[in-house]
Amino acid sequence: MTHAHAIARAPGAIDAVCLMYTNSKMMKESMLRHAGSWTLNEFIPIAGQAAADNIAPAIGQLQYAMRAPTLPMCQAAFDVLDRNADHVAAMTHCTVTKAWITRTRAGLPNHAMAEVTFHNFEQLGAPEWAEEAKVFARALQKSLALEPMQEPFFEGLTKLTPPWEAEKAFRAQLPAWQLNYAADDYVDYTWHAPTVRLYVGRPTLQAPKSGYRYPEWVRHAMGGVPACIDPMWSKASAVIATTLIDLLSDPSLLEKAQAEFRDRAGGGVGGSKWVAPLLPADFEAPIGYRWPEYVDTPRGREWTVP
């Protein structure tokens, strides 16, 4: 008679996660051509249970985030991931469940909206930072053993760049066929109404030398200081408010934006070039996944992943 602890243990969810992680990493070289600024990142929220014993771990999770300039490129990458998941599950005596966290479409531009928005930005001027903000910024530089600067903020924050000039700078870095770059969730709105994205300078410190990068906490620290962060919010709100007033008071501006939207979408919402939402109509919000839990203890404020 053989003791249960002496028999071979079946592979389980940790093996599945490891195989999926490593094999998909290797397959990245073959998923798509090396062009288009696409990225594929992964995160392991769950890998087994609390302790190791002779029972095969029953659950593991692996989350992927894909950014690419076209939807077919995204689909090609996820086709590879789907096949890998199916084969890994078969190899490890597991079942696989696939679920979306979110899916977004590529953005639909609207030059008419961009023009009226930038016109207001020009009238209002770029944000400016007072001495109180600069004092805090210099203190941050000093805490990093840097020589505090007379003007610690990146000089480009107070200069306005026309959207067509910014577009040209982006295009210089991209292949000619690529129309979209990076990712955000606001882009889904662009398929339902004329939309413009507004970039306003966020407090950023001037680098002491080429190639230097401040740690992330510096950016977050300035985000909690009104003197540093308020110029961005205040200027953005002023530009948005004046743009809305223009659209409400001048019907020709609104009609121009709506006409461009209809043209780009092939007739508007539901048109020949319109892209429908990528998530199904019965999609349930992904609220059941693990998030850090913040708690107050006698030792102070802590967090844990339950």
Tell me what each language-model feature is:
Residues 1-145:
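Midchain, well-structured core segments that form catalytic/ion-binding scaffolds
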Residues 104-306:
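An extended, acidic, His-containing surface patch that forms the Zn2+-binding/catalytic region
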